[in-house]
């Protein structure tokens, strides 16, 4: 949440639309699941902040080429608790460390248009284009937006 507040402070033009959305949702639905579901801009702002800055510590301090390289190698890490064979035939013996380069995935131009630009309402625009307000929500997990993981291994 600290990153979200920092981005809100550095993007003051977003404060009013976010405030209006929250007030309208609460007036209409109160602090309920339905009310929170109406806060699409808030959801998009949070998701875009985490996409742009990442959820790993190194990404936040990207200032040098070495730190950039480190962030590409850093990401979601897990250790295989048993022998695993992946769908492509790759064998991972028990104890193998596996990592996903979250920053690289979330800044790939194949996954996001203009990935190095912070667009606070990027995901609202994507929802409007596809016509599905539940798609691209922060809580949804896709190959290009890992959020906090999935299942019992979620952060």
List each model region and its residues.
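Central I-helix of cytochrome P450 enzymes
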Residues: 1-23, 49
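Cytochrome P450 heme-iron axial ligand motif
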Residues: 137-155
């Amino acid at each position: 949440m600290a990153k979200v507040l920092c981005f809100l402070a550095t993007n003051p033009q977003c404060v009013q639309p976010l405030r209006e959305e929250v007030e309208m949702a609460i007036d209409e639905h109160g602090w309920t699941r339905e009310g929170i579901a109406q806060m699409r801009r808030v959801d998009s702002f949070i998701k875009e902040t985490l996409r742009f800055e990442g959820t790993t510590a190194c990404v936040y301090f990207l200032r040098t080429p070495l730190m950039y390289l480190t962030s590409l190698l850093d990401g979601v890490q897990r250790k295989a608790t048993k022998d695993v064979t992946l769908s492509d035939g790759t064998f991972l013996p028990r104890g193998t460390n596996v990592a996903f380069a979250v920053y690289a995935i979330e800044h790939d131009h194949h996954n996001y248009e203009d990935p190095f630009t912070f667009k606070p309402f990027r995901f609202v625009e994507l929802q409007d284009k596809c016509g599905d307000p539940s798609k691209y929500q922060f809580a949804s997990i896709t190959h290009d937006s890992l959020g906090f993981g999935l299942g019992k291994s979620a952060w």
